[in-house]
């Protein structure tokens, strides 16, 4: 009998009481890992634990709002107290406070940054501290977003946090390499409670709710699917099979898998003495013509047969 790839491993998944995080936790458990569920609500966390235990897996709950060091420490201690060790951290916890720039308050900005960006920082730091002190060649997986890669209207706070996470991952990979620890970002594209309210995705959501596969346009052309479509990538990155992969941003959704490039110049020009205003005014238009980058994710037209119902 083939041994499960994560047998004997212990994973923390932040924000795993429901949604994407729960799907990640359930798949990690299915592949043999013992899992620490994290949520801010005790009942939600307990239900998530029960869903894993009912399938023969091992899980415990740590109820804490991710962001501060105290929560990160509680998660690490919870893993070690329950299962004796820690091998994998999946940073998934997040909140949304979507508003256009002039309507976004300091509180809207700070909360999203605290949970996503600071929460990733504190949880990774305390997990890596454990890895270093105990000689564990562990796995760090943080969740990014297409919004962090491309930008999106009304999500200044979220875009900043998710872009920052990918930047931190590249730095973590450099700092952790000698310890044998890998750090990667996953960019998921999957149905959530939010996408259910967007008419563009109506036919995909309806198919999923009927237990049917989403139309190929969504799964293939958009790379849009279910949480389960992303969970396999999370589990693979957590395994020994992915020990050579670090510092990467990898997208998953529907039938599509994407490896994102690091930011790289598309135009490089030199001018002796540097680039003054006058030199730029004279040459920049020609140098940048056809090379300026777009902002936001571009959606292909929705086929006629997949148009949302009217009324």
Regions of interest found by a model, annotated:
Residues 124, 161, 169:
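Active-site helix of classical SDR
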Residues 4-36:
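Canonical Rossmann dinucleotide-binding motif of NAD(H)/NADP(H)-dependent dehydrogenases/reductases
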Residues 100-101, 105-113:
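Substrate-binding pocket helix/loop in short-chain dehydrogenase/reductase
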Residues 207-311:
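C-terminal helical subdomain
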Residues 145:
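Residue(s) in the substrate-gating loop at a strand-loop-helix junction
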Residues 23-24, 30-31, 150, 166, ...:
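Active-site-adjacent segment of SDR/Rossmann-fold oxidoreductases
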Residues 42-43, 63-74, 106:
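The beta1-alpha1 cofactor-binding region of Rossmann-like NAD(H)/NADP(H)-dependent oxidoreductases
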């Amino acid at each position: 009998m083939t041994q499960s790839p994560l047998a004997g491993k212990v994973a923390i998944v932040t924000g795993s009481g429901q949604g994407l995080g729960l799907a990640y936790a359930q798949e990690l458990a299915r592949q043999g890992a013992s899992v620490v569920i994290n949520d801010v609500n005790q009942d939600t966390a307990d239900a998530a634990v029960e869903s894993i235990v009912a399938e023969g897996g091992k899980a415990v709950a740590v109820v804490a709002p991710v962001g501060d060091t105290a929560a990160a420490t509680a998660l690490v201690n919870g893993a070690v107290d329950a299962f004796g060790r820690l091998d994998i951290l999946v940073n998934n916890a997040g909140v949304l406070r979507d508003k256009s720039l002039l309507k976004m308050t300091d509180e809207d900005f700070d909360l999203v940054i605290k949970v996503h960006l600071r929460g990733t920082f504190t949880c990774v730091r305390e997990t890596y501290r454990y890895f270093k002190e105990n000689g564990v060649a562990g796995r760090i997986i943080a969740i990014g977003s297409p919004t962090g890669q491309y930008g999106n209207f009304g999500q200044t706070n979220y875009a900043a946090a998710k872009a920052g996470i990918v930047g931190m991952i590249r730095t973590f990979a450099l700092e952790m390499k000698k310890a044998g620890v890998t750090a990667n970002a996953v960019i998921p594209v999957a149905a959530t409670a939010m996408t259910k309210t967007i008419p563009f995705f109506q036919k995909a959501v309806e198919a999923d709710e009927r237990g049917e596969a989403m139309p190929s346009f969504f799964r293939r052309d958009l790379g849009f699917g279910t949480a389960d479509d992303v969970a396999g990538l999370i589990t693979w990155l957590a395994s020994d099979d992915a020990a050579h992969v670090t510092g990467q941003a990898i997208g998953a959704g529907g039938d599509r898998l994407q490896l994102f490039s690091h930011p790289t110049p598309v135009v490089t020009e030199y001018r002796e003495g540097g680039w003054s205003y006058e030199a730029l005014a004279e040459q920049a238009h020609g140098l940048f013509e056809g090379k300026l980058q777009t902002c936001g994710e571009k959606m292909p037209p929705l086929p006629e047969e997949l148009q949302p119902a009217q009324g």
